[in-house]
Amino acid sequence: DVPAACKKDIIYKLLSINDKFAKTKIYNDFKKNSVIKPFINNLRKGHVLVNGNYSTLCGNPVEMLLHSIGKFTGESIVGIGNVHSLRFKDNVEILGSRSPHVCQGNILIAKNKRNKLVDKYLNISEEIVVVNSIGENLLQRLSGSDFDSDTVMLTDNNILLKAAKKNYKKFLVPTCNVTAKKIKRKYTNEDKCDLDIKTSKNLIGQIVNLSQELNSLLWDLINNNRKDLDLMELYYDICQLDVMSGIRSEERRVG
């Protein structure tokens, strides 16, 4: 037998010996103070455990392999509206969300579809999700994500899926059409210093914090049955902040 390392090990070991131990004061005090109270405290902080994980995004890898040998037809292998994840069962509907979650258009509902070509040519784990960017606005939907190790929270929790489906078609995805201006730089201390100064003035924190305040105001207006015009104007502002957060995130790379 493995020796008990802490109080909870002793409690569980006593339970395994005699289930009547669950009727004792020692067990009830343990359950109240060590199980229920911490759970409630975590709920108050917004920490709720759900089935799922944070998966690293991998975009259209098989299509890139086909393109490298001149056999890419332009069609998606995984398919529009689908993802390939080993973390969930095949044909299960899953919800995806990334941080920062700026607006209601930043959630993804997708079908988990296992693909034979992905399994054949890629050695992926449960922490990697293969996604599709061909013919769908996935990267903008997931808060301006890209494929340089960005992650997405995936879950098959029915409560969250039901909530996501309520207004999924009503909120369009905020999309950035701003073209980045390329700046030629040299690998010198002067250019590195100039880049550090410019990126140090990044307003990403203020942008996301303001979006949170406006979202709180939006839902307060909804709960108090305010006019649709008020809601749409406010939502447009939130959408602009979503686009701005993506621009601010990317400017560090383009200089």
Question: Where in the sequence are the language-model features?
Answer:
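Core catalytic machinery and nucleic-acid-binding channels of phosphodiester-processing enzymes
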Residues: D1-G255
